[in-house]
Amino acid sequence: MSEQTDTPEESIYHDQRSVALRTTQSVYFVQEHDKVSMLGSLLNDHKENQVVIVVKSKKKADALSEFLISKEFNAHCVHGNHRQAQQKEAATKFNLGALNIIITTDMILKTLELENIKLVLSYDLPDSAQNYYIRLAFMKELGEAIALVSPEDEPLLSDIESNMKKEIEEKVLEGFVASATPNHTGKTKKDRTKKPRHRKNKVKKEQGA
């Protein structure tokens, strides 16, 4: 009897659409060279939360870890250059609340068995829309997802939104100006000419920040 009820719940709970709808999502358009500064500003509002930051490379994970530690964030990076015992130790500290921020890659995130994640911050978008949903699914509960999107990543964002059948809310931080919408080459799913996602001059402070 329990098998009959558990299986459908598991399937529905991890369905891409369900994951997207249960997660509060927002996107910040930003030039690549401004991402580090924006990350620090955003994390100031999440110092007490359990945060996972996902990047594309081990080198970037190391650099962000060093930066955040220099700003007195309780952060640590975990990637393929670390031994399995080191990865497990970091995950245990995170799950116990002794570590607030883990910076990692998609590949390692799948092995860490992290709990109580409140925010998934995509410093880099993944290489596919499917991996974006996988990132969100690791929260397992209601949570928040923030994506920092550089101009070259906007076509992938369009793919993600197309699969989700919903445009992710755009937010802007005071002091950060998004670039003009890049010239796409057929990858973008929707016409953004009437409402460009990267705006040159309009800067507003995020409400509640």
Residue ranges and their predicted role:
Residues M1-K35, E170-E174:
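Interdomain hinge/linker at the junction between the two RecA-like core domains of SF2 helicases
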Residues M1-P8, L68, L96, N163-M164, ...:
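Basic Arg/Gly/Lys-rich low-complexity intrinsically disordered segments
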Residues S18-I69:
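Conserved interdomain hinge at the start of the Helicase C-terminal
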Residues K58-K60, H82-R83, M107-K110, L125-A129, ...:
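Conserved nucleotide-binding/hydrolysis micro-motifs of P-loop NTPases
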Residues D62-F67, F73-K110, Y133:
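Conserved helicase ATPase core of P-loop NTP-dependent helicases/translocases
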Residues L112-D124, G143-A147:
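A short beta-strand element within the Helicase C-terminal
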Residues R135-S179:
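Conserved segment of the helicase C-terminal RecA-like domain
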